From Swiss-Prot:
Residues 50-88 are annotated as: Extension peptide (EP). The lineage of its organism: Eukaryota, Viridiplantae, Streptophyta, Embryophyta, Tracheophyta. Oligomer of 24 subunits. There are two types of subunits: L (light) chain and H (heavy) chain. The major chain can be light or heavy, depending on the species and tissue type. The functional molecule forms a roughly spherical shell with a diameter of 12 nm and contains a central cavity into which the insoluble mineral iron core is deposited. This is Ferritin-3, chloroplastic. It holds the Pfam family Ferritin. Fe cation 2 binds at E141, E190, Q224. Belongs to the ferritin family. It comes from Arabidopsis thaliana. The keyword Transit peptide applies.
């Protein structure tokens, strides 16, 4: 028994009745045309389309950014009291306290360097190169403290200055001499500052404060490494020279380099 494939038009009965054949022509995107039946034999059939894509108002990710809705929760974070910082945002109390501690470290080191400057500037010591070096070092450490204070205010923290330790006023050493002893003391202080800065950086990392971590990295850490290297070289040179006439020549070289 042979089966013949029926043509599309055979789906219409002989009496001209229309049957729904749209499933044969449905697509994800086409135009719609009505069925018209005029004279016998001139038939047309519908081409129906359905657009399945969403409107273009939604983004490709399906997430619509609504700024006025999302900012509502941020508005609740803006304090209304006059004594509260408006700029503070994602700044933990632990980071704030660590910055204040570093400010105190910088001021204390600056104070020691200022005492060293005063010592070498005496008329009975008269090592002007060392005096100038330690005076500049004192100013540099004070500027570091001021940078930290400025950053504290930027983040909405409160600067709380702490007491400073009274530095010694005599730096002569019976074996090493005053120049070598003072430079070794300076090297120890710079390494201490470096440790404190690394500790501050770890506090920032622990609290996921990338802004504070970036500030410490970009402003302080590389400069601290350079300072340690420079003072290490000065210590090595003074150890070679001893306490004699070579100290004066070292001081003159330092005075010329600092000028």
């Amino acid at each position: 028994m042979l089966l013949k494939a029926a043509s599309t038009f055979s789906l219409l009965n002989i009496h001209g009745e229309k049957k729904d054949i749209s499933p044969l022509f449905s697509s994800s995107s086409s135009i719609s045309s009505p069925v018209s039946s005029g004279k016998s034999g001139n038939l047309s059939f519908p081409l129906r389309a359905s657009k399945s894509s969403t409107t273009t108002t939604s983004t490709l990710s399906g997430v619509v950014f609504e700024p006025f809705e999302e900012v509502k929760k941020e508005m609740d974070l803006v304090p209304s009291g006059q004594q509260l910082s408006l700029a503070r945002h994602l700044y933990s109390p632990e980071c704030e306290a660590a910055v204040n501690e570093q400010i105190n470290v910088e001021y204390n080191v600056s104070y020691v360097y200022h005492a060293l400057y005063a010592y070498f500037d005496r008329d009975n010591v008269a090592l002007k190169g060392l005096a100038k070096f330690f005076k500049e070092s004192s100013v540099e450490e004070r500027e570091h403290a001021e940078l930290l204070m400025e950053y504290q205010n930027k983040r909405g923290g409160r600067v709380k200055l702490q007491p400073m330790v009274l530095p010694q006023s005599e730096f002569d050493h019976p074996e090493k001499g005053d120049a070598l002893y003072a430079m070794e003391l300076a090297l120890s202080l710079e390494k201490l500052v470096n440790e404190k800065l690394l500790n501050l950086h770890s506090v920032a990392s622990k609290n996921d404060d990338v802004q504070l971590a970036d500030f410490i990295e970009s402003v302080f850490l590389n400069e601290q490494v350079e300072a340690i290297k420079k003072i290490s070289e000065y210590v090595s040179q003074l150890r070679r020279l001893g306490k004699g006439h070579g100290t004066w020549h070292f001081d003159q070289e330092l005075l010329g380099a600092a000028a």
